[in-house]
Amino acid sequence: MYQNLAIMIIMLPLASSVINGLFLKVIDTKLAQIIATGFLSLSALFSLVIFCDAGLDGNIIHIKLLPWIEVGNFKVNWSIYIDQLTSIMFIAVTWVSSVVHIYSLGYMAEDKGIIRFLSFLSLFTFFMLMLVSADNFLQLFFGWEGVGVCSYLLIGFWYSKESANKAAIKAFITNRASDFAFILGIITIIVYCGSANYKDVFSSAELLSNTKIFLQFSILDVICLLLFIGCMGKSAQIGLHVWLPDAMEGPTPVSALIHAATMVTAGVFLVARCSYLFEYSPLVLQFITIIGGVTCLFAASIAIMQSDIKKIIAYSTCSQLGYMFMACGVSAYNSGIFHLVTHAFFKALLFLSAGSIIHAVHEQDIFKMGDLRNKMPVTYGNSLIGSLALIGIYPLAGFYSKDSILEAAYSSGSFMFIFGIAAAILTAIYSMKIIMLVFYGKTKLEKDVFEHAHEPAKIMNTPLILLVAGSFFSGMIGYYLLSMDKPNGYFHESLFNLHIYKLLISHPPLYIKLLPMAVGIMGIVIGICVYNSSTIMSFRPSSMSFPRKRESSKPFNLVYNILHNKYYFDEIYNFLIVKPINCLASLFYLGDQKIIDRFGPNGFSRVVNCFSVLTGKTQTGYVFNYALYIVSFIVVVISVFVWKG
């Protein structure tokens, strides 16, 4: 029974996508909505059953569906592998996806492309489920690339908008750059292990770590580094994060799905799944810790200066992913996945609440909003719960999972603990920035827009109850019932930790355990003080019409410009990569047009045309001309024979 349910969990979203996609022109909109939401809801319910068997009871479900690749001794089967890690990912992916599908029925109700949209959402979910249930690297890569293609389709869903098309292309190309490293990593694995199956590769980890290729670097270090670069692109870590804010051009439900439980978490999942490899590569683990710690602070600092509500939450996602990678870097994979699961619920709640606000006021700039708490009390409550969970306030989910990460970072002696604490303060500040500017103060909306602002339809608000429940209880369940914060807890059979005893014997002092929430409360107070004044320190250009404090000092302006322009990453990449490539492309274009085409196909065609024109002029229609041609030909022939002989 469990095997059949496991197959249905993955195939139901695919069936939904295929039915709605193939019969796009003929299927009734209501029927398409029922199929999409019904199939995804069934998938979510079945994932609960699988969680009870594979997750709670620890039974591994391994189904070999069919042979896929067979070349000599190299064999890969198309399989489904479900253990404790996969089962918890099933819960996060299917439940958040189901809520997003239902929410979309209201949000996209007036959009003519809603059936196409639902088809893309379902396909996205299928590829993510395929990714997390793979038992080999090639099948994982299939799901990995699948979510990349679907993100391109969803970000650019409104293809008539030039900005949406550019954002989709940017996301696609950025991920292709990182995926190139990922492909090289998989190829290296196959070359050195002779297999792509997890079991075979993981059993070779220690041997690979002893195979030195340059100084102290082993082939395993190279493999792990290449795999992690792939993760950096997919999970928007510093340097490869530039696609993330632009991805907000897609419909808001897309943002909730991509940035909560699916595509961006794939990188964290991969590092956790490959813990058997990474544990034997301490150099790469240190690199992961640094990248994660720097990203969580870097992205949080950018979020402070943003004014677009969706971009603030997007950079928040980037920051929280940094926390997850920091946990993996200090070998606390369990804490990283724990935060991944809790984050899926409260981040989806924040995105969909933002969608309700945008749907009501048709505006994304939080500095143009205000005083909406009485107009939209349910949305206000949802946003507040999501924000407090993100900050890590007891007893909400983020309190348990984020604290687990910071405690592990402290116990490992990593300096990134300081970065994590600093990011926690900034997280509280930008979360309060949204709450105070959107729901409090004097509204800056036009009078008729403000008067007509209201709660969205029940079909949009009702499913958010599940996310509210997840934001409240997922942390408690994970901490008290499943012991996800402990390396020998829920994930002890799925994740590998070479030095598990170090984490087990470490007991951070009480003040370290309380510090994250303390700095979170401090950040809340700062946020309220800064954004609740009649003279808001808005950190906006001086051209804005609403009040701001007197001109700041040059150092402040410098910091403001750096953060407001997102550390100039886009400008740097444009100068170093985009412009040189465009110049090279122009050079090749000129070479193609002026040289190859001119003297090649176009030149040859011009010669033929010229010859045909000259030949055509000989066809005068006069008999005496033709007689002249014949006589001339005879004279030439006779002359040749005479000359030769």
From Swiss-Prot:
Locations listed in the record: Cell membrane
Annotated protein name in UniProt: NADH-quinone oxidoreductase subunit L
Encoding gene (name): nuoL
Single GO BP term: ATP synthesis coupled electron transport
Transmembrane segments: 7-27, 31-51, 88-108, 114-134, 137-157, 177-197, 213-233, 252-272, 284-304, 312-332, 337-357, 380-400, 415-435, 464-484, 510-530, 623-643
InterPro entries: NADHpl_OxRdtase_5_subgr, ND/Mrp_TM, NU5C-like, Proton_antipo_N
Gene Ontology cellular component annotations, sorted alphabetically: plasma membrane
Ubl conjugation is among the record's keywords: no
Record flagged with keyword Protein biosynthesis: no
Location, primary (coarse class): membrane
Family: Belongs to the complex I subunit 5 family.
Enzyme class per UniProt: translocase
Its membrane topology: Multi-pass membrane protein
The organism's place on the tree of life at top rank: Bacteria
NCBIfam families in alphabetical order: NDH_I_L, PRK06590.1
EC code(s) of this entry: 7.1.1.-
GO terms, molecular function: NADH dehydrogenase (ubiquinone) activity; quinone binding
Primary role: NDH-1 shuttles electrons from NADH, via FMN and iron-sulfur (Fe-S) centers, to quinones in the respiratory chain. Couples the redox reaction to proton translocation (for every two electrons transferred, four hydrogen ions are translocated across the cytoplasmic membrane), and thus conserves the redox energy in a proton gradient.
Alphabetical keyword list: Cell membrane, Membrane, NAD, Quinone, Translocase, Transmembrane, Transmembrane helix
Reaction(s) this enzyme catalyzes, per UniProt: a quinone + NADH + 5 H(+)(in) = a quinol + NAD(+) + 4 H(+)(out)
